[in-house]
Structure formats: structure tokens, C-alpha cells
Amino acid sequence: MCKDTYFSGEAIQLSDMLRAREERALRQLHLLKEYPEGSLLSVTMNIPGPIKTSPKLLEAFDIVIKAIQTALADDKICYQLRLLPTTGYEYYLITSLPSQDLKLKMIALETDLPIGRLMDLDVLVLSNGRPSPISRTTLGAPPRQCFICSKEAKVCGRLRKHSVEEMQTAISKLLHSFFNKDNQSSSSDKTG
């Protein structure tokens, strides 16, 4: 397993990332105002370091998007947008499903899908005129765990407990295991 397989994209600068976050917040605000009766799902990947994109990361992203669409197959989807900037992949979806129900489905997906923990599946609502994510903990779900040490992810992030190198290695191992397991089950499906 080579880390370069997963982190082979174009490196970005901090200024690029800050601009992308600003644009994402404006896009989220626009969508919440344009679809006031719908629920907004905003999907990005948790990829540390200056390289946010690669063919394998895109493959993982698209697998999760497909899983989201499958999970919401019985619900009306009013709008979808998939963006592939070098600052990280983005996906937006508006559904008629109530926001809290949508968040519960996304928590289940993050938990059930082995690579779900690499994603931010944010369900956003307007709060004081700004997009605000619904917290997992307000719905009774535990905080997300760090994929390196299993402690609370936000605490590890805030304290910068793990190096970018450590996190990229852990992500590479997770993706390698996921893709190899997926290939093995595909092979056994064909022979079975």
C-alpha cells in the first residue's frame, strides 16, 4: 500500500482553502434560502494536508454519494450538485425529508460505511441568518471518533494531536483495506 496512490493530486495553498470555505458557506446560504422548505445536505471529505484530491479519493467520494442517494431513494430529492475543485470534493443535496431525519440517516451511513468516517455529512439549517450544522450529539449520537486513536475527533483536531503524515497514513490504510475488501467481494460474487 503506497500513500502516494491516495494523495497524488495537486497541492493547494491555505489561501485556496480559505477561499473555498467562504464560497461553500455562500453556496450553502443560497441553497437554504432558495429551498426554504427542504433540508440541505453538504458533503465534503476529511482530508488533512495540502493534497485534497486524487483519482482514488474521488472514487471513495463517489461511493459515498451513491450510498447517500440509495439511502434517500424513498425521499424526494429536489436538487443535487457535485463539484470537484482541487480544494476538495463537494456535494450538495436538497430533500423533502425533515432535517433531523436526514441527519439521523447520515449518522447511520457514516457509521455503517467503512469509509463514512472520512466524510463530513453536514445537514444544515438557517440559524440567525447563517448556515449551521445539526450536531450529532443533539440527536443523541456520540461524537465522532478519531480514526487514529478513537478519542473524540474534534478534541484531537483542536489539539493537533496527530501529524498530517500520521493521518494520511491512517487514511491510506483505511482506503486500501476498503478497496481491497470491495474487490475481493466483487471477485467472489463472480465466481460464486
Curated annotation (Swiss-Prot):
**Natural source organism:** Streptococcus pyogenes serotype M18 (strain MGAS8232)
Superkingdom to which the source organism belongs: Bacteria
What is the documented function of this protein? Transfers 2-(5''-triphosphoribosyl)-3'-dephosphocoenzyme-A on a serine residue to the apo-acyl carrier protein (gamma chain) of the citrate lyase to yield holo-acyl carrier protein.
Q: What class of enzyme is it?
A: transferase
Q: Which InterPro entries match?
A: CitX (IPR005551)
Q: Which UniProt keywords apply?
A: Nucleotidyltransferase, Transferase
Q: What name does UniProt use for this protein?
A: Probable apo-citrate lyase phosphoribosyl-dephospho-CoA transferase
Reactions that this protein is recorded to catalyse: apo-[citrate lyase ACP] + 2'-(5''-triphospho-alpha-D-ribosyl)-3'-dephospho-CoA = holo-[citrate lyase ACP] + diphosphate
What EC numbers are recorded for this enzyme? 2.7.7.61
For molecular function, the Gene Ontology terms on record are: holo-citrate lyase synthase activity
Question: What biological-process terms (Gene Ontology) are attached?
Answer: prosthetic group biosynthetic process
Family statement drawn from the similarity comment of this UniProt entry: Belongs to the CitX family.
